[in-house]
């Protein structure tokens, strides 16, 4: 089985975008907020949004399952307040659940959290628990910077985040570190802010005792880990200068990296630097980079093709990257797959 651990619902129906526009337009007058019940999307309309996109690419590229979540840029936690974020997150998560119900062999859900700048993360616990226990989701996307590029909140190592981490450990789900849209003009969203968020989270983990407090807490850092693999020597050296244990001991029981890296040399670097046991296959198809690479004639985000070309990866290595590591990191995934096989 080929498991893609990083997929977003980027082909949403127009009705969802219209609802969001009405929600934002009502920020100054809460009495005008649209009711979630006003959003009408049929199952056939949902099918139409993925049949020609995510499902098409699954079939063409030979992948089997996508761990699927709402559009990352669309989370936009900096817009509105916590009540706006909650309604928006619930709606987006419910659409993911419906798609996973229609296509149980193709998609398994990961939830958007109703974060809001300056608001205690424990307010996200109920939505996380709902999505995991009621919808069968296997993880969450966690935004380290709900302010949208201004980094106004506590670092991820701060005890402020602990109520959320406690629930993640209790129900055995990991979080993918994923910022959302940038409202800071200095930081392009997908070219800078995403990679900055990945790199920042890693360094916050490195300089903390977080995994002493939560030895089973797990994070996936997407987009190949931001700058981390390229500067692995820097991070090893910083840890050494701080009299910390080696990174393998300090972080790599808890921190994992995906393969959303869009050229072969980048994947080669990732697989040379990061232990195979810490790499999860992912493509983020129909995501940040959607075009065809003129140098190869293939889509940039067809990342399976790159992994297949890495000559030093054994068949066992590739099995770990494509399947085994996702089954290990997403603690609820095996049981969820068994249920979908029986019902699909």
PLM regions: where:
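Structural motif corresponding to alpha-helix initiation and N-cap regions
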Residues: 48-52, 121, 125, 158, ...
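Catalytic metal-binding/acid-base residues of hydrolase active sites
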Residues: 8-10, 145-147, 180-181, 225, ...
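Active-site gating/metal-coordination segments in enzymes
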Residues: 64-201
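Glycine-enriched alpha-helix->loop->beta-strand junction motifs that scaffold or abut catalytic
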Residues: 135-138, 169-174, 190, 214-217, ...
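Hydrophobic faces of well-ordered beta-strands that scaffold small-molecule active sites
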Residues: 3-7, 66-68, 108-111, 140-142, ...
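Aromatic-lined glycan-binding groove of carbohydrate-active enzymes
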Residues: 4, 206-250
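Mid-to-C-terminal alpha-helical segments outside catalytic/metal-binding sites
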Residues: 1-5, 12-65, 94-102, 126-130, ...
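Proline-centered flexible-loop/turn and helix-kink motifs
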Residues: 104-105, 136, 163, 212-216, ...
